[in-house]
Amino acid sequence: MGKSTFLQDFKAFAMKGNVIDMAVGVVIGGAFGKIVSSLVANVIMPPIGLLVGGVNFTDLKWVMKAAEVGADGKEIAPAVSLDYGQFLQATFDFLIIAFAIFLFIRLITKLTTKKAAEEAPAAPPAPPAPTKEEVLLTEIRDLLKEKK
């Protein structure tokens, strides 16, 4: 066998089924993340914000130092703030994505287990009990062995 080149090694690695499956999973996961982020930001959080007094969670922040504004109204120095609302939003996104992935994996596991149980070979049937004739013949054989 000759030496394999770097490109041949990379091609062999990249064409493995697991790597391709993982790449597809990453792409689908990225798209799924965007869908869930939109669901959280546009569907789930507005009613929750309404219930707690019309709060938009992404706007929640703690201003540690106010912005400095000049006499002409232009901002001289930006405000220093801790934007914890965006953190809350990202946390809700994560929890919902994690829960959705958990449900998906649980479904796949159940289907795989069910399919494996259906495909599992049945235990071989127990051999039938010997008939009366077979028992009698066995006893005769044993008696003949004893006489020898």
From Swiss-Prot:
Keywords: Cell inner membrane, Cell membrane, Ion channel, Ion transport, Membrane, Transmembrane, Transmembrane helix, Transport. The keyword Transport applies. It is found in: Cell inner membrane. It comes from the Bacteria. It is a multi-pass membrane protein. GO terms for biological process: monoatomic ion transport. InterPro entries: Mechanosensitive_channel_CS, MS_channel, MSC/AndL, MscL_channel. The chain crosses the membrane at residues 12-32, 85-105. GO terms for molecular function: mechanosensitive monoatomic ion channel activity. It holds the Pfam family MscL. Homopentamer. Channel that opens in response to stretch forces in the membrane lipid bilayer. May participate in the regulation of osmotic pressure changes within the cell. NCBIfam families: mscL, PRK00567.1-4. This is Large-conductance mechanosensitive channel. The lineage of its organism: Bacteria, Pseudomonadati, Bacteroidota, Bacteroidia, Bacteroidales. The gene is mscL.
